[in-house]
Structure formats: C-alpha cells, structure tokens
C-alpha cells in the first residue's frame, strides 16, 4: 500500500486485486480482458508467495518484481526487473538472476516517525524528558529467548518491561516513552524459510531515541552496525544481555549512536528519498521497454545462467 501511495505522486497509479473482488479497486481478470497485451501499463508485483502465478498471468506485459523477503525458491523469467528493498535481497537476486535488470530502493519510514520521533538532535535537544518504560518488546516476531528468558529476567531485576501485543493507537508515542527496544527476529524468519525483507521496527526505534538491541539477520545488516547503531541481542549468555541492557537503562545516552549517525541513517529512509530513487528507476524502466529488455518471451533478452 505504501508503494502504491508513493508511486501515485510520481505517475498515475492503480491498486489492482487478484484474489478477491473489491468495491474499491479493479479486479485483475477484468483489467487484463479490457487491455490487450502488452498494454500501456507497467505492472508491479510484490507478494512473494504469489509472484510466480502473477508473472504467468501477466506474461507479455511489462512487469517488475518488488522483492522484499528472499528464499521463496522460485526463479524469475528473463526480462523481469527486480526492485529489491534491501541489499540482502538484491544480493540474492544478483546471484539467482544476474541477467535480469536489478535495482535497489529501501523501504521508507512514514513521516510521523521522522517528525515526531523524540531522538536526540544535533543541537543536543531531546523532546522527551521522561521515558517510563525501561524496555519495550513487540511480541510479534520476537524469539522464545526474548519472551521466555530475557523478559522475565529483566523483570526480576526490577526493570519495567512492556510487551506490546495488541493494537496501539499511537506507536510513535509508545516508542518515545521507551528507553530500550528489543528486536530479535532471526528465529521467526528461519521458521518461515524466508528472509527478513527489510525490518522497519529497528529504524522506528532509532527515530524515537531508543537504545536498540537487535539481531543482525538478513536485511537488518543493511542498516544496523554492531556496537554503533545497535547492540547484539543474545550475545553469548543471558547474563551478558542482562548486564548490558541494565547499563543502557541506567544511562541511555552512553549507548545511543551519535545524533549525526542517526540522522544520516534516517535521511536515507525518508519518503522523499524513496520517491527520488523510484523516479530515476521509472525512467530507466522506460528505456528498457524501448530496448525490448522487458519482454519475457523475446529471444533477444539475456538469460541468466
């Protein structure tokens, strides 16, 4: 939905459903019947599990795969460009489809995180004077280690730990009121057999001035540097985690990245930067169409080995 919303600021954009009909959006079968191939539209598919079927239905039309998670196991036909949301995913397709056109546009943070996040600024101003939550954990994607071992041990040490599992009206406010944010998704994604496609929550935490303890699996390694922007969770022993997290609660400023480091990281994740990158890619895709490089059936298109 974010992709459709932001692309609509660059080109006329329509969201199309393909599993169920909707009163709010066109249905794929109807659109394909009304517009003979190849048509004038550029199609973008993104839901990994359905990509092979979607590409088959769109054969003969210009189509782009916006790739989030990797590891689904399918291959791509020649002539289908990939726009990866992480360098981790870019490398995956650079290996599996080296002759397909490859691009990289990381996901964007919503403006509310950049505008309202209470991180220390370059002028040493902190918009938050009170952070009553010592440690924030979001239950979804969290590992059994975090939920069953680390959280109880932190609570036993007297720390106030918030485990968020339901709907929250204002996530920015929740993060702004937290000193530490824990994110450990490696086990979650391993159990699903695919990679962490991007990982926005750690960036959201940094935008709100939280000290970040995180895993570094898959796309998280794109943006997080151990000991600089984030600290490894599950580092060796439970006791080691307890000592480090307790120290960060006692003195968060000693564990935060430099304000300039955070701002540089967040600037690269803004919607403005996203739109600029996509605008450049759309121009390149137009060139590819003119050169016949986006035809899945053309004999001229290079095949990946």
What are the language-model segments listed below?
Residues 63, 161, 182, 212-213:
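Hydrophobic beta-strand scaffold residues
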Residues 1-49, 215-220, 226-235, 241-243, ...:
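N-terminal pre-catalytic "stem/leader" segment of glycosyltransferase-like enzymes
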Residues 245-265, 285-293:
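Conserved donor-nucleotide binding/catalytic region of nucleotide-linked donor-dependent transferases
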Residues 95, 104, 108-174:
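Conserved catalytic-core segment of nucleotide-activated headgroup transferases in glycan assembly
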Residues 176-192, 210:
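Acidic donor-binding loop of glycosyltransferase active sites
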Residues 17-97:
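Extended catalytic core of nucleotide-activated donor transferases of GT-like folds
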Residues 176-177, 201-210, 215-216, 226, ...:
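Conserved donor-binding/catalytic loop of nucleotide-activated donor transferases
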Residues 185-199, 217, 221-222:
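Nucleotide-sugar-dependent
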């Amino acid at each position: 939905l974010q992709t459709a919303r932001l692309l609509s600021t660059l080109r006329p954009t329509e969201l199309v459903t393909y599993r169920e009909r909707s009163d709010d959006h066109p249905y794929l079968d109807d659109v394909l019947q009304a517009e003979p191939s190849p048509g004038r539209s550029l199609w973008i598919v993104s839901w990994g599990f359905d990509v092979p079927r979607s590409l088959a239905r769109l054969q003969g039309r210009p189509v782009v795969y916006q790739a989030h998670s990797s590891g689904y196991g399918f291959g791509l036909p020649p002539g289908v460009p990939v726009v990866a949301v992480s360098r981790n995913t870019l490398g995956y397709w650079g290996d599996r489809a080296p002759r397909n056109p490859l691009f990289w546009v990381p996901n964007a943070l919503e403006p509310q995180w950049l505008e309202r996040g209470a991180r220390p600024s370059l002028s040493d101003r902190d918009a938050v004077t009170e952070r009553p939550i010592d440690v924030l954990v979001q239950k979804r994607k969290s590992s059994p280690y975090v939920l069953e071992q680390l959280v109880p041990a932190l609570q036993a040490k007297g720390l106030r730990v918030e485990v968020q599992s339901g709907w929250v009206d204002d996530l920015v406010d929740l993060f702004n009121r937290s000193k530490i944010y824990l994110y450990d998704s490696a086990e979650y994604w391993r159990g699903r057999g695919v990679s962490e496609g991007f990982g926005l929550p750690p960036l959201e935490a940094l935008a709100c001035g939280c000290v970040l303890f995180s895993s570094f699996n898959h796309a998280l390694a794109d943006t997080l540097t151990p000991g600089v922007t984030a600290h490894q969770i599950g580092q060796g022993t439970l006791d080691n985690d307890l000592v480090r997290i307790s120290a960060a609660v006692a003195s968060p400023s000693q564990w935060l990245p430099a304000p300039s480091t955070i701002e540089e990281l967040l600037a690269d994740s803004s919607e403005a930067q996203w739109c600029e990158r996509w605008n450049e890619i759309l121009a390149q895709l137009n060139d590819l169409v003119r050169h016949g490089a986006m035809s899945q059936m053309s004999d001229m298109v290079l095949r990946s080995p």
